[in-house]
Every structure is written in structure tokens, then in C-alpha cells.
């Protein structure tokens, strides 16, 4: 269930796939939404959230924060995250493709709609290419 598989399935570019990643920032779970072709930079995630540090959540923390297994996390709903952050690069597309709660389901949305529904803050979250 990789971003690459998802891009192939819907016939879009990898950068239009939304990866939903849970980070633990100063003990609280946050959701970072990144393009499928980029890796999250933990230092940038921490900076965006105003936290001292950020680390990738462990699998059990992902489930606790979102109710979903790692790899199947949709951008919403995320009942126990304190905030959602969207990488600015995603906002440049007309349509992005998000996981919809399982590795087999995917939905296309405007990135502005994703940001609105999740009340996401736009930030630079990705490692330099």
C-alpha cells in the first residue's frame, strides 16, 4: 500500500498523493500531510508546530491518535491529534489523492478542501529534495 502504488492506481503523479504521517511533538500527536514523493523533515515539523522536538509516532501511537493503522491513515478524521499541518507543495495542485481509511480506498479532493476540513496550517515540512 505505498504512495507509488496509489499513484499508479488512479493515474496521477506521485506528488499528488497525500501521505498522512503522525508525529509526536512534545508528547502530543500531530498529523503532517506531505506529497507522496517527499520525506518529512522532523525538525521542520517541530518548527511548524512550535514544539521543541518531533519524532515519528510508533505504530501503537498512530492507532491511538487516529484509529487507523500506519499506512492507512486518512487526513481526516483524526480524533486525537492536536493539529494538522499540510506541506505547501500540496497546495499547488488542483486535485490531490488521499487515503480514505484503508489501503484499498482513495479519494480525490482539492487540496484547499483538505486544508479546510482538517483546519490544517500550511508549512514547509519536507526534507530538501
Describe the function of each predicted region.
Residues 1-129:
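Extended, low-hydrophobicity, polar/charged segments
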